[in-house]
């Protein structure tokens, strides 16, 4: 149970692929102009990570070490092609919005890195969980960045959600404030870099505060009964 918890915590927070490893920044910065696009690409990446980790882990004993990387790439490319066809069939609007960034999941360092670092060494169930956790960590980072950029740039949230979830999702659109023209700095790549920088700073501050609390709690437990540590 502790190993499962560690895999989940590492993927979602401690070893977050976007905020700690800083991998996959090209799609992270390019696609997160809206929350819907960010969520769509994040979920697609999560599905690819889960399936490729599961497949590579299952075949790890029959994969020659000398040619393992080309085999990993072929497996990843096959899964990405299947996911791309699914999005094309059931979410065509999202497919058009994401464009080239769906097939580019094949070259995403996150996917290849988890295959080599984790799936090739662990069992199928734990590898699938690792892929899901890493993918959801990246999805959360994309979604937060996409939401911030959409709110600041357009004053809306979940605009175009029907392209991802169907016609019923039109009711999810929220207009936070009205604007006649978008704030282009937030919608263009410079806004993505600024937003990512703020998220990195926020995560650092949260980690430092949590570390300080753990240190204070450990110091209090180490004191003899009746002492407060104050001079």
Swiss-Prot record:
Coiled coil: none annotated. The keyword Transport applies. It is an enzyme of class 7 (translocase). Pfam families: Rnf-Nqr. Keywords: Cell inner membrane, Cell membrane, Electron transport, Membrane, Translocase, Transmembrane, Transmembrane helix, Transport. It is a multi-pass membrane protein. The chain crosses the membrane at residues 18-38, 39-59, 63-83, 86-106, 125-145, 182-202. It comes from the Bacteria. GO terms for cellular component: plasma membrane. GO terms for biological process: electron transport chain. Its main location: membrane. InterPro entries: NqrDE/RnfAE (IPR003667), RnfE (IPR010968). It is found in: Cell inner membrane. Its EC number is 7.-.-.-. The complex is composed of six subunits: RsxA, RsxB, RsxC, RsxD, RsxE and RsxG. Part of a membrane-bound complex that couples electron transfer with translocation of ions across the membrane. Required to maintain the reduced state of SoxR. Belongs to the NqrDE/RnfAE family. This is Ion-translocating oxidoreductase complex subunit E. It comes from Escherichia coli O139:H28 (strain E24377A / ETEC). The gene is rsxE.
């Amino acid at each position: 149970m502790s190993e499962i918890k560690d895999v989940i915590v590492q993927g979602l927070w401690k070893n977050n692929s976007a905020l700690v490893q800083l991998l996959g920044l090209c799609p992270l910065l390019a696609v997160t102009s809206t929350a819907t696009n960010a969520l769509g690409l994040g979920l697609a990446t999560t599905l690819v990570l889960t399936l490729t980790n599961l497949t590579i882990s299952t075949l790890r004993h029959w994969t020659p070490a000398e040619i393992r990387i080309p085999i990993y790439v072929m497996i990843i490319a096959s899964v990405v092609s299947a996911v791309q066809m699914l999005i094309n069939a059931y979410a065509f609007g999202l497919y058009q919005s994401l464009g080239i960034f769906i097939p580019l999941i094949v070259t995403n360092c996150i996917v290849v890195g988890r295959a080599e670092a984790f799936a090739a060494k662990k069992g199928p169930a734990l590898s699938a969980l690792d892929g899901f956790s890493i993918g959801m960590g990246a999805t959360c980072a994309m979604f937060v960045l996409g939401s911030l950029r959409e709110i600041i740039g357009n004053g809306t949230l979940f605009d175009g959600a029907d392209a991802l979830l169907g016609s019923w999702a039109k009711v999810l659109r929220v207009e936070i404030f009205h604007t006649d023209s978008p704030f282009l700095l937030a919608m263009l790549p410079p806004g993505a870099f600024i937003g990512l920088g703020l998220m990195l700073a926020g995560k650092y501050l949260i980690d430092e505060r949590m570390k300080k609390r753990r240190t204070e709690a450990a110091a209090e437990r180490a004191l003899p009964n009746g002492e407060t540590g104050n001079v």
